[in-house]
Amino acid sequence: MSVYHGKTKKRQMLEVDKQHWLPQQVQVTLHALMGAAKEGLLALAVAVGLDVLRSMMEAEVTAIVGPKGKHNPNRKAFRHGAEEGRVVLGGRKVPIQRPRVRTKDGQEVRLSSYEAFQDEQLLTQAALERMLHGLSTRRYHHGLEPVGDDLPAVATSKSSVSRHFVAATRKALAELLARPLGDQRYLVLMLDGIEVADHTVVVALGITDDGQKQILGLWEGATENATVCRALLTDLVERGLRVDGGILVVIDGAKALRAAVRDVLGARATVQRCQVHKKRNVLDHLPDEARAWVSRKLEQAWRETDYEKARTALTSLAKTLDDKYPGAAASLREGLEETLTVLRLELPEALRKTLRSTNPIESAFEKVRMASRNVKRWRNGQQVLRWTAAGLLEAEKGFRRIKGYRQLPMLSEALSRHAAPEASSAVQTA
């Protein structure tokens, strides 16, 4: 057993000796890091990071005033002790002794190495990412990377985290509302609303001519009314949204949205009603025992590859519903032809499946709901907008090209054909 311990001690000495390959400025003793190592690799990394930062600051001081203990008659500054400072590491502020330097006339010399680690944008971004992934302000410190038991931390209180999160979401909202849209050709515009507390936020998602999805804007109101929808669309146009070559607008079926599209975008917009919303609206007028077969009939009609056959099937279904369920029949007839726009444009199946509904926005809404599930009190519309914008932009990071994007030139051509006669008709009328 004694031999075993002897070998262990010898092995530890060899491990310590291996540090000699490191540059002198970044050498750290293993014994000083053993405690941090117990907290895991992240704590070890923070400990090493602090040690490297100390070496960097010392190197910068030496570059300014010269080596310690060596007289330099030409130096313009001198060492002035040290004081406690704070740097940002691991999503919080941690204390560190920072060296001070003064000029001959007593002016403080700022150390760039120290200031680089004081950037509070790192805290703001850390707060944003953690809270968007469901961590509440009260439990924020539980979600931080370990930095070691012997290292105190600040800027992790509920109020501090909340301030940083507000700053981050305010910035996200401002950037989203200021996005220029004139540099891209958007073939598709999807519009849908999400309810947050007593507020409704109408969101616009665009699909470019190469199949990329992008959040274009959002507008808040008490309901999904025409004024709110018109304001959103007007904002998009003012930021450069082009519809001169035609654009497919996929909407959830709200009359306010339909009216706003007509008023702002005019004849250049070709409207596709969301089939998912339409089915939901029709089924809401039916008793449970009738929903299954009506749902099957709707899906069969929408799966048709011929526009006239699909239209005939839906019209026939509406007649069947007339006697027993007139509310469902009326709901189906309202905007019936616009649920078939992707068929009328003769788009291939892959594109039809993608553009038949507002599901791409709905998937982004799920991210907003997940991110904001811990919010217990909604104070105002600005708070709702900030959270929604931040959640949407987080969802946008995971966006992929739509299925069928290689067939988008067919959509572009179809939209141009549709927009041209409408535009010439409008000119003749004028």
Feature map (PLM): residue ranges:
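Inter-helix linker motif
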Residues: 267-284
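Dynamic "connector" segments at or just before major functional cores
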Residues: 1-152, 159
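Conserved phosphate-handling catalytic cores of large alpha/beta enzymes
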Residues: 279-306
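RNase H-like nuclease fold core
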Residues: 2-7, 63, 69-70, 77-80, ...
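Amphipathic alpha-helical transducer elements in NTP-driven molecular machines
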Residues: 50, 54, 58, 137, ...
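Acidic/histidine-rich catalytic cores and adjacent linkers
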Residues: 1-36, 48, 54, 58-62, ...
